[in-house]
């Protein structure tokens, strides 16, 4: 994969972030209209044909969309500004003090100084497996997190390559881009889960209250619409996640002038990337290699369309030819 300049990659990711911020409200609006149309179609007896159905749909959409957009906006603001603590809790990470490991601080500081970057925060996951990730949306929240295993089992050159990989994510602004996509997908996931659980509860109480039939239909329609949104938003998120790994590998090779060290690190990481605390798929894609069992099977079917990471063998091969 051809590597592009830092400024070009930053500009591209800033543009993509802007496009996501524009496309997401549009997707929400389209899905809201679809929900209104389906609801009118299945619940209202229309004696005046398609025109009246569309008129009623338009009126319901106009009445409903301000509340939908308002709720989504509140969710986005909360998730956007609390993402660091959410990710830390989801991965079991904690701050790594300088006195605990001066070696790591020296490696990070030297790389940051060579690139003119501000020093990020450093966290550690107390897990013997090998993995790492970058997170944050600005200089105040940028963080590099390393597992205990990756610190102990990689030599300095390999660890420098991994750190450079994560610093490239930060420098290229693709950490922020990915977090925005994660927040968006999370909204659809939450709506689908709420609708699914509500349908289950309503169907369970149906025998006691036949009036629940209409409510169940509404919830089923909401679940279908939310699932459609989740599907397309997830595809977009996965595509962003896969490409960013190639770019970060190339950036790390350029930063350290030692692509073979990162290739060696990836080989060791691929042998044991599983982080026990990580259960959420959206958080898993932040890591240098998928930290769960899907690391071995994510590429099966549809040519890896639903994979969060590209094949690590391909990444290693590219680095060896860099």
UniProtKB/Swiss-Prot annotation:
Positions bound to Zn(2+): 165, 169, 245
Main location per the UniProt record: membrane
Superkingdom classification of source: Bacteria
UniProt entry tagged with the keyword Transcription: no
GO cellular component: plasma membrane
Any Pfam family: Peptidase_M48
Residues annotated as transmembrane: 19-39, 61-81, 175-195, 216-236
Record family assignment: Belongs to the peptidase M48B family.
Protein name (database record): Protease HtpX homolog
Organism name: Bacteroides fragilis (strain YCH46)
Lineage: Bacteria, Pseudomonadati, Bacteroidota, Bacteroidia, Bacteroidales
């Amino acid at each position: 994969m051809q590597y592009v300049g830092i400024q070009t990659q930053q500009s591209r990711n800033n543009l993509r972030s802007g496009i996501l911020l524009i496309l997401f409200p549009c997707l929400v609006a389209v899905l809201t209209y679809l929900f209104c149309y389906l609801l009118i179609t299945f619940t209202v007896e229309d004696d005046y044909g398609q025109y009246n159905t569309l008129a009623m749909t338009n009126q319901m959409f106009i009445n409903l969309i301000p509340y939908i957009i308002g709720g989504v906006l509140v969710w986005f603001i909360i998730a956007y500004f609390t993402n660091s603590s959410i990710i830390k809790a989801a991965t079991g990470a904690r701050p790594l003090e300088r006195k605990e490991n001066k070696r790591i601080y020296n490696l990070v500081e030297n790389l940051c100084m060579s690139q003119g970057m501000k020093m990020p925060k450093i966290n550690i996951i107390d897990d013997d497996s090998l993995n790492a990730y970058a997170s944050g949306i600005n200089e105040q929240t940028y963080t590099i997190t390393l597992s205990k295993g990756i610190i102990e089992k990689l030599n300095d050159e390999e660890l420098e390559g991994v750190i450079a990989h994560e610093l490239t994510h930060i420098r290229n602004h693709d950490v922020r881009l990915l977090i925005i996509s994660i927040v968006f997908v999370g909204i659809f996931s939450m709506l689908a889960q709420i609708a699914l659980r509500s349908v289950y509860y309503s169907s369970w109480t149906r025998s006691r209250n036949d009036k629940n039939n209409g409510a169940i239909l509404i919830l089923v329609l909401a679940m279908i619409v939310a699932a459609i949104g989740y599907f397309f938003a997830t595809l977009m998120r996965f595509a962003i996640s896969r490409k960013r790994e190639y770019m970060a590998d190339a950036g790390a090779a350029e930063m350290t002038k030692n692509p073979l060290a990162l290739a060696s690190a990836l080989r060791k990481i691929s042998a044991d990337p599983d982080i026990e605390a990580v259960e959420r798929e959206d958080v898993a894609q932040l890591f240098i290699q998928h930290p769960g069992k899907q690391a071995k099977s994510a590429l099966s079917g549809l040519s890896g369309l639903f994979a969060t990471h590209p094949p690590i063998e391909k990444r290693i091969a590219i680095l060896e030819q860099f």
